[in-house]
UniProtKB/Swiss-Prot annotation:
Encoding gene, per UniProt annotation: GSH2
Residue sites binding ATP per the record: 216, 381, 435-444, 446, 471-474, 497, 524, 530
Keyword hit for Zinc: no
Name this protein carries in UniProt: Glutathione synthetase, chloroplastic
Disulfide-bond pairs as recorded: none
Subunit-level organization: Homodimer.
């Protein structure tokens, strides 16, 4: 979660927020989990993969189907739930989580991130889903395939990536190393004939403008496809059990099948690679308390698609990996069909040259990368800012309606060489967020720190400003929620961020998959600027459509 709320909504006079006419109303019937799907939701038999007729065809998000006339009413305000009921909800959730696998490693245990099954605790969760407007839910789902296609097209424009990041390269060593690998692939004309994207586009709903605005588009290590599904099921279970007390309809929580849709895309890419003996390798961190989210995906691949997965760190891949003459990547004696990154997105993942050697080795191979180096760069903050400039989307997309739908989601984004914006940010820092080229929580700069950072960069005058962008600060509605972490629940004033997953796969002749693929809802205390769950700022949540 990248943009916090510390004051009532404030509009930016420097931002043009154009409204576009809505498209035709969307057709009927969302797919919801039925009661019969409750026991083993992640490992149900796969349905046929949806193959769109056109790469840019938007997913149609249908109307809700419920049996209750009053089902569109907002869920009860958690602030009004008495303490006895809160305790019942918490106790039932504490039993449900270990039974269903809604778990993370205990941050107080040294072994919890390295040894599976040891020192587990429930994932941090909200006990009641967050109300969310159905119209904005549909909007976010509808643009997911367009963003998928945009990432693919941007990734194929090496000149655009290199030029857009040229100043950033000089100011940010991490981006420079990524661009170095990208340049080497361009020099040898390395073509990715099979391209796989597992993305997540994160949004906040601005309270004053009522616009759904994009925080960022993640193209590497889009986390929580496994646990997010379980939170939706937990909330449906609790609302069903306490339906009379809470007076809500569990069917207003939309189906969330992200983990199986991720598995479908990975399995289809594995199949396209064409070697039934090859494996999918998960590139992971040496210590990973969120390993169970990853293991849910491995389980879905094994149970639904009979695909074997292995887990290796970048250092292990350097030590055990080799590239055969035909481009086959072999790690620890096993041929690799697909490389799925759950690490490698931050400088802290590269402890030495060993990790960089592993990244280059994988990029040189003919294995399908998720993401490739070009997909990784296409998701950088600087590229997000470049795409928000006038007439840049037109370089990659032809359909005017698609372009309008994406622009409607864009918040204000600026480089630090725009002097008028920098001046305004120094005068009114509360209206901006300063973002470095980093993934994961805890990196952004807020409030008075924005002014201090900008003045420092101006004084230094070394070009270090190219390592950052400025973004409009979004001020979402403050809502009440009940948050539970480490067995302790408490009511809080909170804000939320919606992430929409997308899956994209194409070979050299056609797009095989391009669709919205579930969601992630994260909720945090409204006074907190940052919002990553794994970083300890937020909890997992689900949405209740109103």
């Amino acid at each position: 979660m990248g943009s916090g709320c510390s004051s009532p909504s404030i509009s930016l006079t420097t931002i043009a927020t154009s409204h576009f006419q809505s498209q035709e109303s969307l057709s009927n019937s969302l797919n919801f989990y039925s009661p019969t799907r409750f026991l083993e939701p992640h490992l149900l038999k796969s349905s046929k993969i949806f193959i769109p007729k056109s790469p840019l065809k938007c997913a149609k998000v249908p109307e809700m189907q419920t049996q209750l006339e009053d089902s569109a009413k907002p869920i009860v305000d958690p602030h009004d739930i008495d303490s006895k009921l809160v305790q019942k909800l918490a106790n039932d959730a504490l039993v449900w989580c270990p039974l269903r696998g809604l778990l993370v490693g205990d941050r107080n245990s040294e072994r919890s991130g390295t040894i599976p099954g040891v020192d587990m605790v429930h994932a941090p969760v909200a006990l009641i889903p967050m109300s969310f407007p159905e119209s904005h839910w549909k909007q976010a789902c509808e643009v997911a395939p367009i963003f998928n296609e945009l990432v693919d097209r941007v990734s194929q424009d090496g000149e655009f990536l290199q030029q857009s990041l040229s100043r950033t390269r000089k100011a940010d060593p991490f981006t420079s190393r990524l661009l170095e690998i990208h340049s080497k692939m361009l020099e040898i004309n390395k073509l990715e004939e099979i391209r796989l994207g597992l993305h997540r586009s994160d949004y906040m709903l601005d309270e004053q403008t009522k616009l759904l605005l994009q925080i960022e588009l993640n193209t590497i290590s889009s986390s929580f496809p496994g646990l997010s599904c379980l939170v939706s099921e937990l909330h449906r279970s609790l609302l069903q059990q306490y339906r009379e007390d809470i007076a809500s309809d569990p069917n207003r929580i939309p189906a969330n099948n992200a983990v199986n849709q991720f598995a479908e895309a990975l399995a289809k890419a594995w199949n396209e690679y064409g070697d039934p003996r090859a494996v999918i390798i998960f590139v992971v961190q040496a210590e990973e308390r969120n390993m169970y989210d990853q293991h849910w995906l491995s389980a879905s691949l094994r149970e639904r698609h009979q695909v074997t997965t292995i887990r290796k760190t970048l250092a292990e891949i350097d030590a055990l990996g080799e590239l055969q003459q035909d481009g086959t990547l072999v790690v620890d004696g096993q041929a690799v069909a697909v490389i799925y990154f759950r690490a490698g997105y931050a400088p802290s993942d590269y402890h030495s040259e060993s990790e960089w050697k592993a990244r280059l080795l994988m990029e040189q191979s003919r294995a399908v990368k998720c993401p490739s180096i070009s997909y990784h760069l296409a998701g950088s903050k600087k590229i997000q800012q470049e795409l928000a400039k006038p007439n840049v989307l037109e370089r990659f997309l032809e359909n005017k309606d698609d372009i309008a739908k994406l622009r409607k989601c864009f918040a204000g984004l600026w480089s630090l060489d725009e002097s008028d914006i920098v001046k305004d940010a120094i005068e009114r820092p509360e209206l901006y967020v300063m973002k470095p080229q980093r993934e994961g929580g805890g990196n952004n700069i807020y409030g008075e720190d924005v002014r201090g950072a900008l003045l420092k960069l101006q004084k230094e005058g070394t070009g270090s400003d190219a390592a950052y962008i400025l973004m409009q600060r979004i001020f979402p509605k403050i809502s009440h929620s009940i948050l539970m972490r480490e067995g302790i629940s408490h009511k809080e004033e909170t804000i939320s961020e919606l992430g929409i997953y997308g899956t994209y796969l194409r070979n050299k002749t056609e797009v095989l998959i391009n669709q919205q693929a579930g969601y992630l809802m994260r909720t945090k205390v409204s006074s907190s600027d940052e919002g990553g769950v794994a970083a300890g700022f937020a909890v997992l949540d689900s949405i209740y459509l109103v």
